[in-house]
């Protein structure tokens, strides 16, 4: 997830308080403030605080003061030690080269351009790819934020918004969320078997987000094959809609989170999960609660590209897969020949990470 920072260096607290409050409400990750305001920020809420200075204070992250001569900055940051940030204004090629060298010695490199938009940022992103440094691009609008976050394939690691407009803070949050979405390839699988298998422990994942019809999570018994299990976004004659919930399946099952997998049984409050819709568009959500209960289970097997894949779900009419045309289909009505959406990967998994290895899972 891209980081969102707010520059809030006005000397008067009343000038920055509404901006910081909006940043907190919008899920920003860090605010850059004067040291006089550190404790006032902490009274508002929990957010990382960065300050400019020559030595550490009570802030969470020190950013090397720009008044330190450039020839001494790298020595100074090495003496102070990590975590530490650097700040460079890019006005020339010389500035770009200095920023790149400084980035090799800091955790965060804050860069602000004067008459440039993309090219120096591209150069720094490419030059610092092998270093443990996050590039934070200073911007003044959501339009500039979109450019910074999408530069090259990777984009900047985050943006530092310098604005006096609370509405711009919300627009940057929306832009970052939009750019954080990606598409995953979904295929159509043909159901070949549906079989009740008795009792088992199943996992309900209650998130802090509301899902729509056709949205859910990718779950499966194999680490490289996942069924799109829809959220409980629809009402039924038996129970009210719970659009924050995915009744995801048995405790042994894998769930795809980002580009990795986890066991359903491992999930807990505060974890991040990936929501996927019928078109393969993804977004992140936070787990609010996980419920594991003993319930009757049903085995669903399907074939895709000549391969058989499976998952175990609770045997209940409210549990739904997503059909090839995007409509939900209850496991209580599922039958051989039905078409459902799945995601299949070519590589196996080891500790949740994709690897090139021969693994047989049945």
Curated annotation (Swiss-Prot):
GO terms for molecular function: 3-dehydroquinate synthase activity; dehydroquinate synthase activity; NAD binding. InterPro entries: DHQ_synth. Its EC number is 1.4.1.24. The keyword Amino-acid biosynthesis applies. It is an enzyme of class 1 (oxidoreductase). Keywords: Amino-acid biosynthesis, Aromatic amino acid biosynthesis, NAD, Oxidoreductase. It catalyses: 2-amino-2,3,7-trideoxy-D-lyxo-hept-6-ulosonate + NAD(+) + H2O = 3-dehydroquinate + NH4(+) + NADH + H(+). It holds the Pfam family DHQS. GO terms for biological process: amino acid biosynthetic process; aromatic amino acid family biosynthetic process. It comes from the Archaea. Catalyzes the oxidative deamination and cyclization of 2-amino-3,7-dideoxy-D-threo-hept-6-ulosonic acid (ADH) to yield 3-dehydroquinate (DHQ), which is fed into the canonical shikimic pathway of aromatic amino acid biosynthesis. Belongs to the archaeal-type DHQ synthase family. This is 3-dehydroquinate synthase.
């Amino acid at each position: 997830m891209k980081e969102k920072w707010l520059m809030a260096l006005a000397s008067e607290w009343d000038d920055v308080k509404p901006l910081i409050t909006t940043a907190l409400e919008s899920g920003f990750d860090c605010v850059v403030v004067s040291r006089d305001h550190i404790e006032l920020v902490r009274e508002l809420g929990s957010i990382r605080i960065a300050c400019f200075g020559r030595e550490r204070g009570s802030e969470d992250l020190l950013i090397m003061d720009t008044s330190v001569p450039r020839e001494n900055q790298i020595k100074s940051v090495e003496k102070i030690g990590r975590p530490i940030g650097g700040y460079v204004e890019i006005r020339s090629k010389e500035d770009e080269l200095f920023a790149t060298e400084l980035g090799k010695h800091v955790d965060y490199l804050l860069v602000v351009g004067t008459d440039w938009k993309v090219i120096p940022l591209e150069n720094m992103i490419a030059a610092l790819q092998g270093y443990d440094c996050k590039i934070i691009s200073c911007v003044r609008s959501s339009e500039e934020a979109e450019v910074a976050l999408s530069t090259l394939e990777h984009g900047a690691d985050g943006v530092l918004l310098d604005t006096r407009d609370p509405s711009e803070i919300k627009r940057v949050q929306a832009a970052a969320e939009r750019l954080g979405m990606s598409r995953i390839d979904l295929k159509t699988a043909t159901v070949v078997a549906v079989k009740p298998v008795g009792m088992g422990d199943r996992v309900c994942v209650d998130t802090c987000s509301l899902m729509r019809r056709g949205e859910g999570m990718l779950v499966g018994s194999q680490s490289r094959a996942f069924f799109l299990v829809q959220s409980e976004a629809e009402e039924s004659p038996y129970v009210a809609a719970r659009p924050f919930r995915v009744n995801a399946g048995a405790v042994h099952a894998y769930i795809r989170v980002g580009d990795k997998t986890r066991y359903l049984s491992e999930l807990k409050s505060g974890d991040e999960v990936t929501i996927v819709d019928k078109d393969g568009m993804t977004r992140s959500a936070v787990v609010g609660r996980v419920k594991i209960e003993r319930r009757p289970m049903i085995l669903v097997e399907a074939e895709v590209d000549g391969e058989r894949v499976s998952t175990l779900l609770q045997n209940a009419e409210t549990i739904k897969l997503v059909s090839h045309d995007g409509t939900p289909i209850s496991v209580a009505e599922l039958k051989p020949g039905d078409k459902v959406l799945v995601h299949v990967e070519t590589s196996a998994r080891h500790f949740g990470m994709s690897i090139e290895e021969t693994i047989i899972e049945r």
